[in-house]
Amino acid sequence: MEHSGPSEVTGADTAGPDPQLAVTMGFTGFGKKARTFDLEAMFEQTRRTAVERSRKTLEAREKEEEMNREKELRKQLEDIEPTPSSSSAVRERSKSSSRDTSSSDSDHSSGSSDDELIGPPLPPEMVGGPVNTVDEDILGPLPPPLCEEGEDDDDDDLEDEGEEDNPIHRIPDSHEITLKHGTKTVSALGLDPSGARLVTGGYDYDVKFWDFAGMDASFKAFRSLQPCECHQIKSLQYSNTGDMILVVSGSSQAKVIDRDGFEVMECIKGDQYIVDMANTKGHTAMLHTGSWHPKIKGEFMTCSNDATVRLWEVENPKKQKSVFKPRTMQGKKVIPTTCTYSRDGNLVAAACQNGSIQIWDRNLTVHPKFHYKQAHAPGTDTSCVAFSYDGNVLASRGGDDTLKLWDVRQFNKPLFSASDLPTLFPMTDCCFSPDDKLIVTGTSVQRGCGSGKLVFFERRTFQRVYEIHITDASVVRCLWHPKLNQIMVGTGNGLAKVYYDPNKSQRGAKLCVVKTQRKAKQAETLTQDYIITPHALPMFREPRQRSTRKQLEKDRLDPLKSHKPEPPVAGPGRGGRVGTHGGTLSSYIVKNIALDKTDDSNPREAILRHAKAAEDNPYWVSPAYSKTQPKTMFAQVESDDEESKNEPEWKKRKI
């Protein structure tokens, strides 16, 4: 048997693993062969790619410079009136340029040398030839008119892009619809996440449901109820899933109802005689507002006049989940007027009556994470705090007629502040636009002193960029839905307005404005047909129609038509009616039962009337005493003193 030397490599060794070794180790192979790389080829490919990229960049830059030079030349030609000499000069210059270019390309040189000016000169806009791309540094002839039209299109595109970048053009205010809630202030607005239903609440205790898909042009609510009886509605908000609505009223107990208005749960009322509000199971004073958690289903928050902010769960209405107690810098109680969650739900923000804004971590209820004590004027009700969609900025609407913007990451001073925004209601709203570039709030006015406005501020510069005059009443609530791109406004005269743009908005009010109002069915009535016969006899002639007033006076005299009640019966009753003893049967019976049957006659005189007849004709008593006692004897009258003397000792009164 021959064995190969150590320097020899067999084909089996190079092709794959040893079969005997594979059988011994229990596997079929050693995997894929290691990949080899040719570094020189890779380096050459990288170099070529870099050169090609640099060449393209240089060509694009040179082409842009050439276009700029052509534009300048075209402007100069437009300013100067064309003459034959000038046209010839331009033509000669273009021809000389073509000759210079022909050094690199013979075809172009032959074509340009044959091109000569024959006849009158052409207009400046038609003078030109193909752009020479061989040498970018040489100024070529004028471009054709099609290039100018393309440049105009580019300018229009740039203008359209500028309009899209301007946030004012995104405000949907071209059209509006008005929903009649009532006659009193609309103090609460809520829109579900899908934008299908709107719910409104007001000072008239009513909560009304509006379905955009089910409404027609009459704009009528499909349901109205009073969930909190005689308490004003202060806040309405749909949950993040849209199946429940949080109702906050002037009472101390918040309620949760479903989409159809049926009650799901009611928070318990706390013990108002306990000093520490953390030991009570619920609020003990009037509520201000409430808010759903943006991430956790079934969790919501309320704030009250008992100086607490409480977190609740729908599954446990008998006790709150946690309690936040706002405090002043001196540790005293302070009433929160509004509260909200951050966009991620990790922070809880509340504004208080002393002008401070306090922000807690949701899991740490003792000390606030951020506390700014002079955010607004002390003693005023801050009506709203709202987080931006990115979660970094907080907007606050103060009762001191200001709107301020805060950075949560540096909560030591306001970023911007806007004044001269009057407010008269403790629930005036402020909100961010869906693209986070605008901030919206409403203004209040006295009755008959102007119109309420919806004011838009740019977030980056905080300049007042736009205003919408709503109505001759205060603007209380405002809501900008991100999916519908529609703005809902609640006013002080009982109206809820919806602003939209057919090109920028989706669904919502667009679904109901296209539906025609249903016509009411007229009841069919049969009227008497009058036949006018002027030559008929008077006995068959029908009486003329009198005026309504005269007909009513005539009907009044008729006891049957006027339903005149029967007069009372004088004297004894007749026809089944009781007479003078009363108008009803019960009074007659009472009078007969309570009759006074006392006899006022003297009994002695009544007996003495028969004394002479008894003496002349004795029958009963006198014959019995005629023999034994013929002479009548009467008892002697004794005084009271003698009677008392004859009494025994044990009966005498002791003095």
Curated annotation (Swiss-Prot):
Pfam family, one: WD40
Organism of origin: Rattus norvegicus
InterPro entries: G-protein_beta_WD-40_rep (IPR020472), WD40/YVTN_repeat-like_dom_sf (IPR015943), WD40_repeat_dom_sf (IPR036322), WD40_rpt (IPR001680), WD_repeat_GAD-1 (IPR051858)
Cross-link position per record: Glycyl lysine isopeptide (Lys-Gly) (interchain with G-Cter in SUMO2): 297, 591, 597
Acidic residues composition bias: residue spans: 148-165
Classification of source organism: Eukaryota, Metazoa, Chordata, Craniata, Vertebrata
Protein name: WD repeat-containing protein 70
Keyword check for ATP-binding: no
Assigned protein family: Belongs to the WD repeat GAD-1 family.
Biased composition (Gly residues): 572-582
